[in-house]
Amino acid sequence: MKKNQFLKESDVTAESVFFMKRRQVLKALGISAAALSLPHAAHADLLSWFKGNDRPPAPAGKPLEFSKPAAWQNNLPLTPVDKVSGYNNFYEFGLDKADPAANAGSLKTDPWTLKISGEVAKPLTLDHDDLTRRFPLEERIYRMRCVEAWSMVVPWIGFPLHKLLALAEPTSNAKYVAFETIYAPEQMPGQQDRFIGGGLKYPYVEGLRLDEAMHPLTLMTVGVYGKALPPQNGAPVRLIVPWKYGFKGIKSIVSIKLTRERPPTTWNLAAPDEYGFYANVNPHVDHPRWSQATERFIGSGGILDVQRQPTLLFNGYADQVASLYRGLDLRENF
């Protein structure tokens, strides 16, 4: 495995830029004006989630046992843990980047059930302990690129998805893998009301081609920075596909289903002209409302240190994954 290229420590994201972009997305979905039409009582009920003192704090993640294979270690400057866990998109808990950390303590992650079904010879179910004990865990330092044109470098902990799928024995009919987030509106305010959750249809769903899911880079992730995932990062288990935009990294997964047909995906359903099924990081294919040619790295510096850097094709993993898309028009299949 080739070492990844360096990112500059001083590259930091200007949050105001992306807050404006998020508002543009919500406007396109028709959320802003509709939200203003809510009666006062409804506003009070919704905003009660965000008052602060009545929300349980997120539990501290437990230390995990894991290896550090040399192939997945590198000298990339890491994004500090407070930014990894404090600057998140998880609309089930609100739209601002700080909302998930503030509100996700309500999510109960133990007990937990993850079911693998569909076009498999041996359907199976994992419980909470299985997620950290059934497979050897390893730390992998990956780039993470958001579709909003900001990026991080994160030391995720998990196991390759292909090991889990191998246990289920996909049949010859399996062509795709569909993922689903837990549906728990009593714990997730964004699922309870469309104005908190950005107007998306829940539960959140995602999908990969089977060959993408079986690729060694694709990681079922249970930890970060040496500890179990905090709720705002997708506890107890989430998907990391480092060559794709971050919205493909579905969080708090309860179902993995192998299918014959391409499964629906949440952001593609919401805005198919803006968010494709593949969502491969590509500096040559812009979002309709902003460029993807460059990105801002969230590092250890402050706002005055902001610098842009070029976006790398497949987020810097082209040597490993470009062959998956040989002959595929990446502009048409974005």
From Swiss-Prot:
EC annotation from Swiss-Prot or TrEMBL: 1.8.5.-
Q: Which GO terms describe its molecular function?
A: metal ion binding; molybdopterin cofactor binding; oxidoreductase activity, acting on a sulfur group of donors, quinone or similar compound as acceptor
Entry keyword set: Metal-binding, Molybdenum, Oxidoreductase, Periplasm, Signal
Q: Would you indicate the residue range of the signal peptide?
A: 1-44
Required cofactor(s) = Mo-molybdopterin
Q: Where in the cell is it found?
A: Periplasm
GO BP of this protein: protein repair
Q: Which InterPro entries match?
A: MsrP, OxRdtase_Mopterin-bd_dom, OxRdtase_Mopterin-bd_sf, TAT_signal
Q: How is it modified after translation?
A: Predicted to be exported by the Tat system. The position of the signal peptide cleavage has not been experimentally proven.
Signal as UniProt keyword: yes
What does this chain do?
Answer: Part of the MsrPQ system that repairs oxidized periplasmic proteins containing methionine sulfoxide residues (Met-O), using respiratory chain electrons. Thus protects these proteins from oxidative-stress damage caused by reactive species of oxygen and chlorine generated by the host defense mechanisms. MsrPQ is essential for the maintenance of envelope integrity under bleach stress, rescuing a wide series of structurally unrelated periplasmic proteins from methionine oxidation, including the primary periplasmic chaperone SurA and the lipoprotein Pal.
What name does UniProt use for this protein? Protein-methionine-sulfoxide reductase catalytic subunit MsrP
Recorded source organism is Shigella boydii serotype 18 (strain CDC 3083-94 / BS512)
Give the gene symbol. msrP
